[in-house]
Amino acid sequence: MAIRFTPIRSDPPADQVRTITLVPFLPDGRCVLVQGQAGLALPSGEVRDGEDYLIDTVLRVPLETAGFRYQHFRPFGLDGDHLYGWIEGAPYTGWRPHAEPELTAASAEDAAARLRDAGRPDLAAVVRAAARSHRTLDDQTYYADSLRTLERAYLRGRTPQDGSGFGGDEHAWRQARHHITEGMTTAGTFLDVGCANGLLMESVVAWCAERGLRLEPFGIDLASSLVELARRRLPQWADRIWAGNAIDWTPPDGRRFDYVHVLLDCVPTHRRGDLIRHHLAGTVSEGGGRLLVSDYSADSARGWPTAAQTLRALGFACAGESTGGSLPGPPPAPTAWVDSC
């Protein structure tokens, strides 16, 4: 069956979309296919009543059909009420309900060839179109896409964890994020880059206090509305939370921080090295500061690089990484750190 869609570069109106098909990509550019009962497939599903397709359906469908969690979404085609888009992310290992099918990762060219050979030339064409869109994404569009999807989802959250992009309760949150503090061994200042509603700032202060370490928290986020939310939640630190882009933000008063935490997916994959260099040069305290680097979707057992592996591949000396400790639940993806000179 041939698929004939109209190329698009923006989100269709909500009432125009009833079905979505998504092409998943890993941060390294490989395409992910699902091995289903009927053969190779792509995540696809209906928009349910009451769902916002941009927030709800694009999250639910790849989790339910592929066990894949997206961090970035971009539409590229529309056929009537059927939307085609690509997502970038990784296989999911967290607390949300999700499938655990067999996944195959390959270059987009190889993925399209496998689909064609499996008798699905229609899906092969979808993968090729997605790859063209994925290759041409520029930095400005990447950040705009992040704002239009994550900002709305976080602001709609009913719990502090929801408002920080996490799909579990406070106990799951601690299990998934507490390990970040393993790299904090002394009192000092802490900057959370991509702080959202400020929950990680708040949590790190409390968790370190359990070990007798006093941390003074600070935060930045790309979304000004999330910055305002964090300031409302944490009025005692309102003057320490700023709006800014992780790739080029510098402290307004020129200060440096003893600990700086960054997420690799704050920037496009090809800018990760620039992200690390910028913060080592501009936000981490010289001569003893530490840059903590996380990639929450990393899974070395499945071949998705950990933060430490990514740092080494980019040419940085990794001074250590977290172990996850002894908390119950699935082990979190380890945080790694680089020490300043």
Regions found by a protein language model. Name each.
Residues 146-180:
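Class I SAM-dependent methyltransferase Rossmann-like catalytic core
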Residues 1-21:
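Acidic, metal-coordinating catalytic segment for phosphate/diphosphate chemistry
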Residues 74-110:
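Active-site-adjacent beta-strand/loop module that shapes the phosphate/pyrophosphate-binding cleft
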Residues 268-279:
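A short, conserved alpha-helix within the catalytic core of class I
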Residues 288-296:
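Conserved beta-strand signature within the Rossmann-like core of class I S-adenosyl-L-methionine
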Residues 97-143:
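Nudix hydrolase/Nudix homology domain
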Residues 26-65:
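Conserved Nudix-box catalytic region and its N-terminal flanking loop in Nudix hydrolases
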Residues 199-237:
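Class I SAM-dependent methyltransferase SAM/SAH-binding core
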